[in-house]
């Protein structure tokens, strides 16, 4: 059966070469190419330090990135709210399983982000000398798998691609992690694999709902008239599963441990891509496919988002371990995604999308710098890092730029995304004014804490009490050209989006507006309460056109 599938896919690819580029199977290639290429790595010689493997993996990652860019340029219409670049091949018809991929405004920016971050993660992994063949094999498997998560249009296939990420991440943590790597890897697999059962149960329930012949395609599920109780049950299960990945407090405890043991390239993939899978899935399934349940649970998302922002910011402030400090900072920033998804405004939901893209870039940059700093100082304790600013001036400049981006400095992407979320939620008349004021005021506390713990962190690392073992170490070198290049590649879109957010927002505005209208119609089923003001038309504000 699988051979027939790949034969069909190959014939279809050849058949489209004579047609327009919009008919080219861009997404299937971007998924299958890195995965297929990964299986060529075992044939590379074991001699040396893996130089050939590194260049091969980088070439594959760059080609994959160019393929996704080609998909966006040649086949994606930003004004079309529907799924585009659609490819559908019947795979296992008796099980209702179809190779169905496509992209709309919600998935396309994250597909581009995935291929971009992965290419930089491969470059960040250049110093890896231990088992380089296995390391880059796993990275390329993750590349194709993560793109598939955002591209598939079949819920059962989504579950399979979601699970595809578990083993590579587990091995990357367990083999190349720190002293407690086994504990961190085991905790990751227990949390993510355990919660994934809810995705499978929801997929089977939704696919078999009201029919004997299962159909798991998103388009079919979106048109199903699911009962309210059925939607609520599925919503709760999916919220738990996606809440682990986002992560939502209190389902977050695996993340600081994973980040505490991971290497820099794995950091970049965790913070830059893996967390975004949770936010994307909440939009795709909870908000889009289960609108009636979403209308009832949206206030809970707002509250959970505020808890994320405040709790994680306070915890980050108290951390003395550099990796864990940045990890909790990531959890705090993902709280804005929850608030945006819980809002019923186009502006707020657009802000959530932009926050995912923005944090993907900023989180990857900060964690790469954490790894680069650890490689030099051999410590993660802030108390032992003081006084290296004089010897690492370029590194200090890179840290400063990325920290300013993380604290949402105007002119950088984080500022625009957080402003959109705040404005969208506060101006959303679906919620009562007291609820909006209280939630926005509490979230503002987290915003105030962010520059405090980030700037104090910078001071402690570079200009704190001097550690003679570091300041007198002749091997303590400044940033290398490769490291400067990686940060420059990340800062360029961070600043570009901050100055002109329409670079990203235009790609998903049509899809987001359609999703919000769908959710607003579901608000009619929710009675007026101290939280809901009733069925008032939310202001469908568009993204700023700076």
From Swiss-Prot:
Its EC number is 7.1.1.-. GO terms for biological process: ATP synthesis coupled electron transport; electron transport coupled proton transport. The keyword Lipid metabolism does not apply. The keyword Transmembrane applies. Keywords: Membrane, NAD, NADP, Plastoquinone, Quinone, Thylakoid, Translocase, Transmembrane, Transmembrane helix. InterPro entries: NADH_Q_OxRdtase_chain4, NADH_Q_OxRdtase_chainM/4, NADH_UbQ_OxRdtase, ND/Mrp_TM. It is found in: Cellular thylakoid membrane. It is an enzyme of class 7 (translocase). It catalyses: a plastoquinone + NADH + (n+1) H(+)(in) = a plastoquinol + NAD(+) + n H(+)(out); a plastoquinone + NADPH + (n+1) H(+)(in) = a plastoquinol + NADP(+) + n H(+)(out). The chain crosses the membrane at residues 24-44, 56-76, 106-126, 132-152, 156-176, 188-208, 232-252, 263-283, 297-317, 326-346, 352-372, 396-416, 437-457, 484-504. One of its GO terms (cellular component) is plasma membrane-derived thylakoid membrane. It holds the Pfam family Proton_antipo_M. It is a multi-pass membrane protein. GO terms for molecular function: NADH dehydrogenase (ubiquinone) activity; ubiquinone binding. Its main location: membrane. NDH-1 shuttles electrons from NAD(P)H, via FMN and iron-sulfur (Fe-S) centers, to quinones in the respiratory chain. The immediate electron acceptor for the enzyme in this species is believed to be plastoquinone. Couples the redox reaction to proton translocation (for every two electrons transferred, four hydrogen ions are translocated across the cytoplasmic membrane), and thus conserves the redox energy in a proton gradient. Belongs to the complex I subunit 4 family. HAMAP family: NDH1_NuoM (MF_00491). This is NAD(P)H-quinone oxidoreductase chain 4. It comes from Prochlorococcus marinus (strain MIT 9515).
């Amino acid at each position: 059966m699988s051979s027939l599938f790949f034969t069909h896919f190959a014939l279809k690819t050849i058949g489209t070469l004579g047609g327009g580029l919009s008919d080219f199977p861009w997404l299937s290639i971007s998924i299958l190419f890195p995965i297929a290429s990964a299986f060529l790595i075992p044939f590379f010689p074991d001699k040396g330090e893996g130089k050939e493997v590194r260049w091969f993996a980088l070439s594959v990652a760059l080609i994959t990135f160019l393929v996704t860019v080609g998909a966006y340029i040649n086949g994606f219409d930003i004004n079309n709210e529907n799924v585009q670049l659609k490819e559908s091949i019947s795979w296992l018809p008796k099980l209702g399983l179809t190779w169905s991929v496509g992209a709309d405004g919600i998935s396309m920016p994250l597909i581009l982000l995935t291929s971009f971050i992965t290419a930089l993660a491969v470059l960040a992994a250049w110093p890896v000398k231990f088992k380089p063949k296995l390391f880059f094999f796993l990275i390329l498997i993750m590349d194709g798998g993560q793109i598939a998560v955002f591209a598939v249009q079949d819920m059962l296939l989504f579950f399979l691609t979601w699970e595809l990420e578990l083993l590579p991440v587990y091995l990357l943590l367990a083999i190349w992690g720190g002293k407690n790597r086994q504990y961190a890897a085991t905790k990751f697999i227990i949390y993510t694999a355990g919660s994934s059962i809810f995705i499978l149960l929801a997929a089977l329930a939704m696919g078999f709902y009201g029919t004997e012949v299962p159909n798991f395609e998103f388009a079919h599920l979106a048109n199903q008239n699911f009962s309210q109780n059925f939607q609520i049950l599925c919503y709760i299960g999916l919220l738990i599963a996606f809440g682990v990945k986002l992560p939502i407090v209190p389902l977050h405890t695996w993340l600081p441990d994973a980040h505490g043991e991971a290497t820099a390239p794995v950091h970049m993939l965790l913070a830059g891509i893996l967390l975004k899978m949770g936010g994307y899935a909440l939009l795709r399934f909870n908000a889009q496919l289960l609108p009636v349940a979403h209308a009832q649970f949206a206030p809970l998302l707002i509250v959970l988002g505020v808890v994320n922002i405040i709790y994680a910011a306070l915890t980050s402030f108290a951390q003395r371990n550099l990796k864990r400090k940045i990890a909790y900072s990531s959890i705090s920033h993902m709280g804005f995604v929850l608030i945006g998804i819980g809002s019923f405004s186009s502006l707020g939901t657009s802000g959530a999308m932009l926050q995912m893209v923005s944090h993907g870039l900023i989180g990857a940059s900060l964690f790469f710098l954490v790894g680069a700093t650890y490689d030099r100082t051999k410590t993660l304790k802030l108390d032992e890092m003081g006084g290296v600013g004089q010897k690492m001036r370029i590194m200090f400049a890179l840290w400063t730029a990325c920290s300013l981006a993380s604290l949402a400095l105007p002119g950088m992407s984080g500022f625009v995304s957080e402003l959109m979320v705040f404005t969208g939620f506060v101006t959303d008349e679906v919620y009562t004014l007291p609820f909006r004021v209280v939630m926005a005021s509490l979230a503002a506390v987290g915003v105030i804490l962010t520059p405090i713990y980030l700037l104090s962190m910078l001071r402690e690392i570079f200009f704190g009490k001097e550690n003679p073992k570091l300041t007198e170490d002749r091997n303590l070198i400044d940033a290398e050209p490769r490291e400067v290049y990686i940060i420059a590649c990340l800062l360029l879109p961070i600043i570009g989006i901050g100055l002109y957010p329409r670079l990203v927002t235009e790609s998903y505005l049509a899809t987001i507006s359609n999703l919000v209208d769908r959710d607003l119609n579901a608000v009619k089923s929710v009675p007026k309460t101290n939280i809901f003001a009733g069925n008032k038309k939310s202001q469908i504000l568009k993204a700023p056109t700076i």
